[in-house]
Amino acid sequence: MASFETASDRLLNKQICMRCNARNPQRAQQCRKCGYGNLRPKAKETRSA
């Protein structure tokens, strides 16, 4: 995906809120927008159909 290691870290090391799909920092415990506690790590690979 990204050309450089630091670029891919910036793009992929995120948490995604399961309720509102907001991007949050990796260390987040709850969503910054809606306060929901169920966060998932952002997918590192694209999904195939």
From Swiss-Prot:
Ribosomal protein recorded as keyword: yes
GO CC term (a single one): ribonucleoprotein complex
Lineage: Archaea, Methanobacteriati, Methanobacteriota, Stenosarchaea group, Halobacteria
GO molecular function ontology, one term from the record: structural constituent of ribosome
Coiled coil segments of this chain: none
Transmembrane segments: none
InterPro entries hit by this protein: Ribosomal_eL40_arc, Ribosomal_eL40_dom, Ribosomal_eL40_sf, Ribosomal_zn-bd
UniProt xrefs under SUPFAM superfamilies: Zn-binding ribosomal proteins (SSF57829)
Keyword set, alphabetical order: Ribonucleoprotein, Ribosomal protein
GO terms for biological process, alphabetical: translation
Record HAMAP family: Ribosomal_eL40
Keyword Disulfide bond: no
The family this protein is said to belong to: Belongs to the eukaryotic ribosomal protein eL40 family.
Protein name (record): Large ribosomal subunit protein eL40
UniProt organism field: Haloarcula marismortui (strain ATCC 43049 / DSM 3752 / JCM 8966 / VKM B-1809) (Halobacterium marismortui)
